[in-house]
């Protein structure tokens, strides 16, 4: 069993993009920014506990940070982890339902 304190640190924010909204419509998957050291089991447990939905599967990927310039200085954004969480049939989760 994963401690509740860890579950709260696993999920960072929903990732809103055109690809994410297409994934939600076609395969009932939500896209989340998660902690870089989070495992698939931790992500699944956190989503099920915090949002009270049934999770079918979790796919993760590391997103490389972009190189950015500010004048002559060159910097790099941090790498981050993205998770595609597929919900079971009949389950629904709406992050932006109130924005109309």
Swiss-Prot record:
Keywords: Ribonucleoprotein, Ribosomal protein, RNA-binding, rRNA-binding. Disulfide bonds: none annotated. InterPro entries: Nucleotide-bd_a/b_plait_sf, Ribosomal_uL23-like, Ribosomal_uL23/eL15/eS24_sf, Ribosomal_uL23_CS. GO terms for biological process: translation. PROSITE patterns: RIBOSOMAL_L23. GO terms for cellular component: ribonucleoprotein complex; ribosome. GO terms for molecular function: rRNA binding; structural constituent of ribosome. Pfam families: Ribosomal_L23 (PF00276). One of the early assembly proteins it binds 23S rRNA. One of the proteins that surrounds the polypeptide exit tunnel on the outside of the ribosome. Forms the main docking site for trigger factor binding to the ribosome. Belongs to the universal ribosomal protein uL23 family. PANTHER family: 60S RIBOSOMAL PROTEIN L23A (PTHR11620). Part of the 50S ribosomal subunit. Contacts protein L29, and trigger factor when it is bound to the ribosome. This is Large ribosomal subunit protein uL23. The lineage of its organism: Bacteria, Pseudomonadati, Pseudomonadota, Gammaproteobacteria, Enterobacterales. The gene is rplW.
């Amino acid at each position: 069993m994963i401690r509740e304190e860890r579950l709260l640190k696993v999920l960072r924010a929903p990732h809103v993009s055109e690809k994410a909204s297409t994934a939600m419509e076609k395969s009932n998957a939500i896209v989340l920014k998660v902690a870089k050291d989070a495992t698939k089991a931790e992500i699944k447990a956190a989503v099920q506990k915090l949002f009270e939905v049934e999770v079918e599967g979790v796919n993760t990927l590391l997103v490389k940070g972009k190189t950015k310039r500010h004048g002559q200085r060159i910097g790099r954004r941090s790498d981050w982890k993205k998770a595609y969480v597929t919900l079971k049939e009949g389950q629904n989760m709406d992050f932006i339902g109130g924005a109309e």
